[in-house]
From Swiss-Prot:
GO terms for cellular component: cytosol. Pfam families: SmpB (PF01668). One of its GO terms (molecular function) is RNA binding. Required for rescue of stalled ribosomes mediated by trans-translation. Binds to transfer-messenger RNA (tmRNA), required for stable association of tmRNA with ribosomes. tmRNA and SmpB together mimic tRNA shape, replacing the anticodon stem-loop with SmpB. tmRNA is encoded by the ssrA gene; the 2 termini fold to resemble tRNA(Ala) and it encodes a 'tag peptide', a short internal open reading frame. During trans-translation Ala-aminoacylated tmRNA acts like a tRNA, entering the A-site of stalled ribosomes, displacing the stalled mRNA. HAMAP family: SmpB (MF_00023). It is found in: Cytoplasm. Its main location: cytoplasm. InterPro entries: SmpB, SsrA-bd_prot. It comes from the Bacteria. The lineage of its organism: Bacteria, Pseudomonadati, Pseudomonadota, Alphaproteobacteria, Rickettsiales. The keyword Nucleotide-binding does not apply. Keywords: Cytoplasm, RNA-binding. This is SsrA-binding protein. Coiled coil: none annotated.
Length: 152
């Protein structure tokens, strides 16, 4: 059974810049105008990351455009947004992030089958320059392979 996901935004740079050690799903606290803007697909999580503040985890630098029809009741576009996780998950995340070199990045934002906005997070470790070059070579080689197979 495939799970329904209507993807709002993806962070493709994160997959290039980081090794993803673990993926997890979190809910997010939003205002009404933010949800309406997300339904129009006006969001960007390219530079966003998550960090802990004691017993809570917040998503920083996530851009959700202002909703045109909300006029004076609009939201701040880059405000920190609280992520909804169980306390066991938060403790596990904090333990992994405290290890040197690991960070928590947003990989995608989507609506699930119950029309709730979810954020896919990844516990990630940064790639070095030579690792990035290696992944570029791999990607090019796979592209060339598929071209050769199509030509035959």
């Amino acid at each position: 059974m495939t799970e329904y996901k209507k993807v709002i935004a993806q962070n493709k740079k994160a997959l290039f810049n980081y090794f993803i050690a673990e993926r997890l799903e979190a809910g997010i606290v939003l205002k009404g105008s933010e949800v309406r803007s997300l339904r129009q697909g006006k969001a960007s999580i390219e530079e966003s990351h998550a960090a802990d503040t004691g017993h809570e985890v917040f998503l920083y630098n996530c851009h959700i455009a202002e909703y045109e029809k909300a006029n004076r009741f609009n939201h701040a576009t880059r405000r920190p947004r609280k992520l909804l996780l169980h306390t066991k998950e938060i403790k596990k995340i904090i333990g992994r992030i405290r290890i040197k070199g690991y960070t928590l990045v947003a990989l995608s934002m989507y609506f699930n089958k119950k029309n709730k906005v979810k954020v896919e997070l990844g516990i990630a470790k940064g790639k070095k320059l030579h690792d990035k070059r290696e992944s570029i070579k791999e990607k090019d080689w796979k592209r060339d392979q598929s071209r050769l197979i199509r030509q035959k």
